[in-house]
């Protein structure tokens, strides 16, 4: 355990975050309390008193996800807005005090910045944008000093501010605050897509703070990288010019060319021809070596069997490398039905509640856990991992199944969904 703590610098991170927020290390998850400890002293020094907890529970929209275009592509770039929500707060002067001041009818329109849901934020006298600027500078200094625990602590604190302002448990909660962040993010992502496509490229996906761009005219990796660098430079300049022209604001939005996928797969939604969301795979080159990257797919999910994860890894590798894959699919299916892959058919899932608390729609891992006692096995408790297999009689403990394994269920639920994605 001590080696894990040393390798991950968890204690250094906890100490750094505790020192910055004023919370004890056993309360580091308290984002609202962290925000209060950072914001309230500044509010009081400005001569204002904080309100009680809000009774407004109006929901605000989440991150914007662009429809994906399923298919296999060469040369896909990921352009990512660095700390998008903190950048929006800084750029557009979004702040609880600024919102209150912006509602003063004596202020001219030029003295405020428009938000959403009829919000207006004062250009002067706000607190949160300056607090984020200070944290941003501290993070840059921590990065320069190679202080990763401090840098990570600051990043988490900054990124928590949107969630706090969107939480009814926050005394400053106001739907206009959170919506002015997320809806501005929607607008930024949409206009970024429009700019890229007007430049002759194609955006095949986007999610919250990132856009995925197909550089279809690139002949090799160098041309794709050059296009990524040019898009980064041009878009950052365009956003500076647009916000200065439209709002008379100094933009701190920063778009970065983050990743180049030499080959990229956007799968379809199961049973549909529509593109999926938050699920994709691709090949990146690092240090001269090609590496497969999976996001949201079966290969990175612990609740899928080793059979499915191994199958997906090799199947996608063959597809990306233009190698034959049809015979491979048949071979794996035949080996499964012949009982040659039994060791790879174990599901693993954690119990989130006590066994007695599951009454309706009892999931398979709970069914297997309830069989443990009668088969002389330790009974899993809440928080324990349950290993089970699917047999012709249903879910059974992996350590002591009685019925034969249901191979057809594994074909339909583990192999077929992976293959259908391609």
Residue ranges and their predicted role:
Residues 91-143:
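Short, exposed interaction patches on small structured surface elements
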Residues 164-183:
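Gly-rich Lys/Arg/Thr-decorated short loops/hinges at beta-loop-alpha junctions or inter-strand turns
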Residues 123-170:
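Active-site cores of enzymes that catalyze phosphoryl transfer or operate on phosphate-rich substrates
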Residues 140, 213-216:
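A broad detector of the eukaryotic-type serine/threonine protein kinase catalytic domain
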Residues 11, 15-101, 107-112, 146-157, ...:
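DNA-dependent DNA polymerase catalytic subunits
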């Amino acid at each position: 355990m001590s080696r894990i703590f040393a390798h991950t610098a968890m204690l250094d991170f906890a100490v750094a975050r505790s020192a910055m927020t004023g919370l004890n290390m056993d309360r580091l998850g308290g984002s609202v309390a962290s925000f209060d400890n950072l914001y309230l002293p500044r509010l009081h020094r400005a001569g204002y008193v904080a309100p009680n907890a809000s009774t407004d529970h109006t929901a605000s929209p989440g991150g914007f996800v662009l429809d994906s275009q399923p298919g296999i592509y060469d040369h896909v770039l990921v352009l990512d807005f660095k700390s998008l929500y903190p950048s929006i707060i800084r750029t557009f002067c979004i702040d609880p005090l600024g919102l209150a001041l912006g509602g003063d009818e004596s202020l001219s329109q030029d003295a405020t910045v428009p938000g959403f849901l009829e919000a207006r934020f004062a250009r002067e006298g706000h607190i949160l944008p300056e607090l984020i600027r200070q944290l941003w500078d501290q993070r840059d200094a921590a990065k320069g000093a190679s202080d990763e625990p401090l840098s990570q602590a600051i990043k988490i604190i900054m990124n928590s501010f949107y969630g706090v302002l969107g939480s009814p448990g926050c005394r400053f909660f106001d739907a206009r605050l959170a919506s002015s962040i997320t809806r501005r993010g929607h607008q930024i992502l949409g206009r970024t897509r429009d700019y890229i496509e007007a430049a002759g490229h194609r955006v095949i996906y986007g999610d919250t703070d990132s856009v995925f761009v197909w550089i279809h005219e690139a002949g090799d990796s160098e041309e794709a990288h050059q296009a990524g660098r040019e898009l980064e430079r041009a878009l950052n300049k365009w956003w500076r010019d647009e916000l200065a022209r439209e709002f008379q604001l100094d933009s701190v939005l920063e778009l970065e060319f983050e990743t180049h996928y030499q080959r990229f797969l956007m799968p379809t939604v199961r049973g549909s021809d529509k593109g999926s969301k938050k699920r994709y795979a691709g090949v990146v080159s690092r240090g001269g070596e090609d590496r497969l990257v999976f996001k949201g797919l079966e290969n990175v999910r612990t609740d899928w069997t080793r059979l499915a994860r191994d199958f997906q890894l090799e199947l996608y590798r063959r597809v990306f490398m233009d190698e034959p894959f049809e015979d491979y699919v048949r071979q794996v299916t035949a080996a499964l039905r012949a009982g040659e892959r039994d060791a790879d058919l174990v599901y693993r899932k954690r119990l989130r509640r006590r066994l007695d608390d599951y009454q309706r729609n009892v999931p398979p891992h709970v069914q297997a856990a309830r069989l443990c006692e009668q088969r002389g096995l330790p009974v899993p408790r809440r928080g324990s991992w349950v290993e089970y297999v699917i047999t012709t009689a249903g879910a059974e403990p992996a350590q002591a199944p009685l019925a034969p394994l249901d191979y057809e269920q594994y074909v339909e639920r583990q192999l077929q969904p992976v293959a259908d994605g391609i």
